[in-house]
Amino acid sequence: MAIKIFVILFIMLKIVSTSYAIEDKIEAELIANCAATQGGVATATPDGKIYYCAQRMANIEWKYPGAVDYFILHEYGHIVLQSGNEMQVDCWTAYEFSLMNTKKSNKSLKAAIKFIKAFKLPDPKYGGTGEERALLIEKCMEHGSDYYKNN
């Protein structure tokens, strides 16, 4: 599973020509560790480590094929931007996906949005409910990675 995720991340980063990630050649190490994610899909550290929960990712991938690509790139965004601001990183991730504009990237983004919309309880760090977070992601795709600042 780790090799598959690394390959997906590598391919995604190769596709994006105007990305911060490509320009700065920022590397990340993917590490399977469910305890480090504290129940989440994945989490990143500023020093370039992305911890992920393979069981959680497999469950999401089974129900929402392609969605995990969004979450891995999202964690990579924390490293690239050196930011813990979830809305900023969501916006960056959405915009990176919009730059890719491939069949696979569009499928992944749609799957992630569908997964995110299922969350009904508000989480302020992500901008509210799953519906509100999904709307932010959609707007960031359309308007760019700084969209979150004014909304």
Model-predicted regions and their roles:
Residues 1-21:
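Classical Sec-dependent N-terminal signal peptides that target proteins to the secretory pathway
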Residues 7, 14, 69, 76, ...:
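Functionally constrained cores in energy, signaling, and assembly domains
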Residues 22-63, 82, 96-151:
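C-terminal capping/extension segments of zinc metalloprotease domains
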Residues 65-70, 88, 110-113:
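Alpha-helical scaffolds flanking conserved acidic
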Residues 70-82, 90:
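Active-site recognition of the HExxH zinc-binding catalytic motif
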Residues 87-98:
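Alpha-helical segment that forms one wall of the substrate-binding/catalytic cleft
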